Amino acid sequence: MGEGHRTIRVGYGVMARWLNLDDVPGLLAPGQRVFVAGSCGEPQAMLAAIAADPDCAREVTFVQQPLPINQYDLSSFHKSAHQETFFVTPSLKNGLATGGVLFTPMQMRNIFDHVAGMPVDIALLSAARDQQGTIRYSANVDYLDAARAAARAIVVEVSEAYVAPLTCPVVDEAEVDYLVSCDSSVMTYPVTEPDETSAVIGAHIARLIRDGDCLQTGIGAVPAAILAKLSDKNDLGFHGGLIDDGVMTLIETGNINGQSKPIDTGRHVTGMALGSDSLHQWLTTNESVMFRSANYTHDYQVIAQIPGFVSINSAVEIDLFGQINAEVAG
């Protein structure tokens, strides 16, 4: 291990205790599989501590599904480290080329079961306090329940720099091994401004959406353009993997109210929030957004109960696995 590095025995099943950030590398050991929350739930401070003590990552396999806002290639922490992923971002390009990143194409619903069934030694998660001071997980719960079920030990960094969404799951300290205080900022994603072509496409598709339909949206200029053209629709619902600024706007204007949904009536179901600081601020007081893991947001048996379900996604290109690149060519 690096100079000054000390190993900490993970106390499985004991009441959570608080650690310093520089204690986190001591939790890792060769041969471990470590789940790392992705997107806006990434435990930024703990990853920075691990990156600063790279020898702690020797022969460690990290599991993370990142989005473009996640900049780490976790396999780069040590020459013998690996990262298992189900989604490829530009930051993973070098790791893929060298074999450090192991890419398994998989649907999100199946990823949940895959994570729940794999041997996970440690889950690194993130949280913050809500306006009442209750510690809640960050605004990405897509695989949260799976990781909590699979992990032998759970470590949660708690940021004091932002306020947690009002409806994110509460961190039960009896189910957590360690808590780590930090001052990481909430992770935001730039709002997509549709270009002229996207706006035209958006207008065409918006005409196909009927009053009372339930929407699911993805990342990209075209979904953003479609949402921007729905101000004349009524009683729309929302059930999807992510909520963004466009969906927030339609909820605020009343176009999306969830009243036509036979399940989760009046609620807006999502696995994560991906957008501006304004979106995250809005979530600190909004009671209508319901965060659920991918075994609910992406389960066909759940979706089949929602009539008029409309999935809004876009593609720049499609690979041989049938996976869609939503934004970047080349």
List each language-model region with its residue ranges.
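Conserved alpha/beta enzyme-core scaffold
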Residues: 8-330
